[in-house]
Amino acid sequence: MIIDTSQVQDIHSFSRLEFLKEFYGILWVLVPILTTVLGITIGVLVIVWLEREISAGIQQRIGPEYAGPLGVLQALADGTKLLFKENLLPSRGDTRLFSIGPSIAVISILLSYSVIPFGYRLVLADLPIGVFLWIAISSVAPIGLLMSGYGSNNKYSFLGGLRAAAQSISYEIPLTLCVLSISLLSNSSSTVDIVEAQSKYGFWGWNLWRQPIGFVIFLISSLAECERLPFDLPEAEEELVAGYQTEYSGIKFGLFYVASYLNLLVSSLFVTVLYLGGWDISIPYILGYELFEINKVYEVFGMTISIFITLAKTYLFLFISIATRWTLPRLRIDQLLNLGWKFLLPISLGNLLLTTSFQLFSL
């Protein structure tokens, strides 16, 4: 069989087209992921700057002002400094656990962002079990902290890891029960469906008004999960030096630093999605997202507005978290566990029973 030159050229052009098709297919998958990662990184940098400025205002002192205008580049300067610091390893510790621990903490939190709707039609994975996938993934992070504490071969680090695991278990259950109540009210566990269920009734349809007890419990539990004051027992400086972070330096210490703010941001986003209506502005006749389906310009404008609304609600909760840090004193470990097991757990169970009864009688 003889193949002429034109047929060979056709075969080569076809193979090039197939390669370009596969390349653009991979690129189409990577672009949303990379965009989300970039947005999360910028969000964390903004949180660090806001915390320093708000903390300085509460304490009546001057915050960061030299790294960039108004000190906006201070977090970037700190990260660069940690990047070039030496990574020290404990001489008698388990270096494998010591090195893997920070990575597990960061990766488990980053995966949680895949189910968060940042705006109208802006979610990486709209899964039917979105909120419970977040709870399942976030429960992996304390394992990384416990590995870090054990691998450090330091009594303060090990106690900090144990405290982190105990605290996470104590407050994960009330938080899960609150999420289950929201899922029952919305008849779905998808984060997108939960937001759309709230948007049907406007401002008064927010789960903040329908689940006020659950909102307070979720707020307290999320602060405890983020290990923020008054719940920062795993790294209490006066008792444990720095807890599970005591033996860390350089980029590994920076990973814990990033993980704490990533966790704070993801908790704030879930407060917005579950209780504050998500991307919906909740003002009738002002912003109807069905109008944005007319053409691409309206669609992009609608997505931009929805992202802005989501972030505005999220950073409002972040302000409350930062102000709480400098308002309330740290609890003792027995007070922390008693609050979770003897107070929040029974109330969250009662709230779930009331929600279930309401849903059954409304059928």
Curated annotation (Swiss-Prot):
GO terms for cellular component: chloroplast thylakoid membrane. Pfam families: NADHdh. Keywords: Chloroplast, Membrane, NAD, NADP, Plastid, Plastoquinone, Quinone, Thylakoid, Translocase, Transmembrane, Transmembrane helix. It is found in: Plastid, Chloroplast thylakoid membrane. GO terms for molecular function: oxidoreductase activity, acting on NAD(P)H, quinone or similar compound as acceptor; quinone binding. Its EC number is 7.1.1.-. It comes from the Eukaryota. One of its GO terms (biological process) is photosynthesis, light reaction. It catalyses: a plastoquinone + NADH + (n+1) H(+)(in) = a plastoquinol + NAD(+) + n H(+)(out); a plastoquinone + NADPH + (n+1) H(+)(in) = a plastoquinol + NADP(+) + n H(+)(out). The chain crosses the membrane at residues 28-48, 98-118, 127-147, 248-268, 300-320, 343-363. It is a multi-pass membrane protein. InterPro entries: NADH_UbQ_OxRdtase_su1/FPO, NADH_UbQ_OxRdtase_su1_CS. NDH is composed of at least 16 different subunits, 5 of which are encoded in the nucleus. NDH shuttles electrons from NAD(P)H:plastoquinone, via FMN and iron-sulfur (Fe-S) centers, to quinones in the photosynthetic chain and possibly in a chloroplast respiratory chain. The immediate electron acceptor for the enzyme in this species is believed to be plastoquinone. Couples the redox reaction to proton translocation, and thus conserves the redox energy in a proton gradient. Belongs to the complex I subunit 1 family. This is NAD(P)H-quinone oxidoreductase subunit 1, chloroplastic. It comes from Cucumis sativus (Cucumber).
